[in-house]
Amino acid sequence: VFGSSGADALVVNRGSQIFAEGTAAEPIVFTSRANVEGTSTAESIGQWGGLVILGRAPIGTCSAGGTTPGTAGCQAAVEGVTNAYYGGGLANDNSGRIKYFQIRYSGFALSAGNELNGITLAGVGRGTTFEYVQVHNSSDDGIEWFGGTVNGKYIVLTGNDDDSIDTDNGYTGVNQFVIVTHRATAGAAGGDYVWEAGTGDGSVNETVRQDTHFANVTAVANGGAAILLRGGGDYQLTNSVIAGAASSTCLDIDGAATIQAAGAGTDENGPPVFKSVFFACSAPYVDDTNVTAA
C-alpha cells in the first residue's frame, strides 16, 4: 500500500477494523509512492500521511464540556483528520489485528499542532492486536497513543523526526520489546524524544490518568533529553537500556504532579518507577526548576 502525498492517510474509524497480518519473511508494508518508484533516500521523510486507528476505549480529555472521561459520551477529534473522533467507554474495544507490519516515510504537518504521525492509535482498546511493528522515517512521531488501552509487543522505531514514542490523553497500556534509534543523519532535523508523555489538555487532573508501562526497551537518543515525563501521569520503565549522544541527558521529569505520592489524585499510583534500567547519557537527568534532583 502506498500514498502519493503528505495528506494521504489510511483512517480506520470507530466501529471498523483493520486486519493487516504479515509474516517475518513477508511483512505488510505501507510506504510512499517515491519509495515504490525507487526515488526515496536515507533522508526521506513525510512523503505521505500514515495510519490512523480510532477506537472506543477510554480517554482522558473530552471535546464536549461536562462529559465524563472514560464514558461512552466522551470523545475527542483526532489530529490530522477532519471530522474524525475517538474515545468511549469500551476498554476491551477491538480495532483489529496488526502483526509484522511496517510504515515507511510517513508523517505530515497539516498545520502547527495538527500532524499525522507514522501510526496514530487514538482510543484504541486492548482487544486490538498490535505486534511486530516498525515505523521508519516519519516526519512527526513514530507512534502516538491518544488515550486507549491497547498493548503492544515487538516494536521498532527508526529514523523518526519528532518523538519516537508519544503517549497522552489518558493512555493506559503496556508495551514490551521495543527498539528505538533516533534520526541523526547529516542535514536532518534529528529526533526529539525517545519517549514523551503528557496529558491531552495540558492539565494534571485528567480523571482517566495516563498509566503507561514500557519494558525491555533499548533506545539510542540523538540529543537533548531522551525521556520527558510530565502532566501528572503514572509511568514505569523496566529492564531497559537508554543511551544518548554526547550532549544528551537521559531523563527529564516536569511538574510536581508527576512525582506526587500515590493517592494524591484520582487514579494516582505515585511517582515514575524505574526498575533495572541502565542510563548511559552524558548526564542521567535534567536538574531544573520543574523537578530538581532532590
Region locations from a protein language model:
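Extracellular beta-rich repeat passengers
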Residues: 3-15, 22-23, 27-162, 166-294
